[in-house]
Amino acid sequence: MKLHELKPAEGSRKVRNRVGRGIGSGNGKTAGRGHKGQNARSGGGVRLGFEGGQTPLFRRLPKRGFTNINRKEFTIVNLSTLNRFEDGTEVTPELLLETGVISKLNDGVKILASGAVEKKLTVKAHKFSSSAKEAIEAAGGSVEVI
């Protein structure tokens, strides 16, 4: 094999379609835009959600709900991710942040019971699901709500 014999894998390179370059190309003359009309013009086309003058869906449906300004957003950590820590480790939100398990704290950490924990850990967090609490204690660990 020589350098000049190298070829890209089949289908990995696609030649870009140059429109408006003659009839033979299959995309000449109107360049795939059809004849006249709003969509044939430069800058033409309808805005997002426009339905041709008909009352659009988002206005036909009633308003619903509100945004709770006091909503707390917890960073979720599953039990399966706690297995990366050594036996007997005290797992705190600061440690989770340090080790890169979570990227930011938000309003606190909530431990959920997805997966299983096989190690005896002391877990400190802001919230626990009841099944996560049981699983940690069943593995011989302890739970502390901050």
Swiss-Prot record:
One Pfam short name: Ribosomal_L27A
Basic and acidic residues composition-biased segments: 1-13
GO terms for cellular component: cytosolic large ribosomal subunit
Annotated region (Disordered), positions in chain: 1-51
Record field: compositional bias (Gly residues): 21-31, 42-51
InterPro entries xref list: Ribosomal_uL15, Ribosomal_uL15/eL18, Ribosomal_uL15/eL18_sf, Ribosomal_uL15_bac-type, Ribosomal_uL15_CS
Keyword rRNA-binding: yes
Gene Ontology terms for molecular function: rRNA binding; structural constituent of ribosome
Gene3D superfamilies the record matches: 3.100.10.10
Superkingdom, taxonomy of origin: Bacteria
Any GO BP: translation
Keywords: Ribonucleoprotein, Ribosomal protein, RNA-binding, rRNA-binding
Family: Belongs to the universal ribosomal protein uL15 family.
NCBIfam families for the chain: rplO_bact
Role noted for this protein: Binds to the 23S rRNA.
Record text on subunit structure and interactions: Part of the 50S ribosomal subunit.
The name this protein goes by in its record: Large ribosomal subunit protein uL15
Gene behind the chain: rplO
